[in-house]
Amino acid sequence: MVRRLQEYYGIEWFPEDGASYPVRVFLMKDIGTIGIDTSGVSLHKRGYREVSGKAPITETLAASLIMLTPWNKDRILVDPFCGSGTFPIEAAMMGANIAPGMHREFQAQNWDNIVSPKLFSRGFEEAESLVDTSVEMDIQGYDIDPQIVKAARENAKRAGVDGLIHFQQRPVHHLSHPKKYGFVITNPPYGERLEEKEDLPALYRDMGKAFAGLDGWSEYVITAYEDAERYIGKKAAKNRKIYNGMMKTYFYMFPGPKPPRRKKMVQPEE
């Protein structure tokens, strides 16, 4: 590549200053694709998660899984294994209409000779104008680890949604809620180490008992633990195989009943 540029421009040396233009080569079987990386840091990194737990789910996968459920901002959402807060934060960002790339930088922002900085500024300004953090939502995140709960709060603050989520230290067997028709969307422990695997049956039993006490709720669980249904105590209506990075996981769907439709108020005739 350097030789070709030397021939084209008729010069022997290029100064190594200014903006970087990373070149990526992608190989798929016998086909190679060469491109310039305009993003820099991988797009699955939103820019808010500086601290994460043991087996974090990527921001993009969390958002995709939420969109696979019927949840919307008018419904309660609880994550009893919230870790660094990815599910609650992504849900709150959706509800507040916060664009996923607002809290990060892109490699091409420094390419003044190719992309005008005004285009990025205009895009960020437009995205900012559409944000609505005044929206009322009931989103809660719980975890047994007080330090990771603290990290989740800090991540939510960086994402601009700390006022929309309630985080608290709480074990899964204390999970309860007085209201009906809520959602649990969660990424519980998988048991990556042998000693952790021994604890999984009891943990998933506790989760199943907690689910049984939630009246009319829907539960969605992503896990690599293949005995999840057995110990949760019920069969999923649907089970999707999904890769979290290189790890094969399962997205178990336990949909609950739909809430009754609200009756429209009829105005009396004058």
Predicted regions and their residues:
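Non-catalytic, mostly N-terminal accessory regions of nucleic-acid modification and defense proteins
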Residues: M1-E59, I66, Q267-E270
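Generic solvent-exposed, charged/amphipathic alpha-helical segments
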Residues: V2-Q6, R153, G208
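Beta-sheet entry/capping signal
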Residues: P22, I31-T33, D74-L77, D138, ...
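A short acidic Gly-Thr/Ser loop motif
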Residues: M28, F81-G85, N244-M247
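Short acidic, glycine/serine/threonine-rich loops at helix termini
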Residues: D37-T38, R46, A92-M93, I232-K234
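Conserved S-adenosyl-L-methionine
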Residues: I57-H177, E192-R193, E198-D199
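C-terminal catalytic and target-recognition region of SAM-dependent MTase-like enzymes
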Residues: Q168-E270
